[in-house]
Amino acid sequence: MYSRENYQEAKRIIEERRVSAEAEADIRNAQVRSSYPAVAEIDKELTGTGLALFKLACAGGDIEPLKRRNLELVAKRRALLEEYGLGADYTDVKYTCPECKDTGYKGSTVCRCLKEMVEIGRAHV
């Protein structure tokens, strides 16, 4: 039997994990951009291609060339991180539960991590 308090506490803990993981990734991204100008330039271009993709998609234009360029930039960024000895996924968000990305839900389904936390009454862990 689930207690409402335990469920709320489990959701709060999972939310804190998500917020913390995202904040840590933001810090790593900022550090990388300030230490490695080539990565900062790629990030700047990625922001531009992302906006351009959105505009083209809304206008019904051909997004394939920009989509390819975006993928090239992401691959180049990951290669640079490897080259710098950081690991390609260094700036990625490191979620406690990669299945739900620390939301407690996969789509509209309650994730295993939230179920387990509530079921065993370990929301305080």
What spans do the regions from the language model cover?
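Short, charge/polar-rich alpha-helical segments
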Residues: 1-11, 17-44
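Non-transmembrane amphipathic alpha-helical segments
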Residues: 35-56, 73-76, 80
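Short, charged, amphipathic alpha-helical segments
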Residues: 62-72
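Amphipathic alpha-helical coiled-coil segments
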Residues: 70-90
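The −1 position to Zn-ligating cysteines in a subset of zinc-ribbon hairpins
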Residues: 96-99, 110
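Cys/His-coordinated zinc-binding microdomains
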Residues: 101-104, 112-117
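Conserved small/polar residues in nucleotide/adenosyl-binding loops
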Residues: 123-125
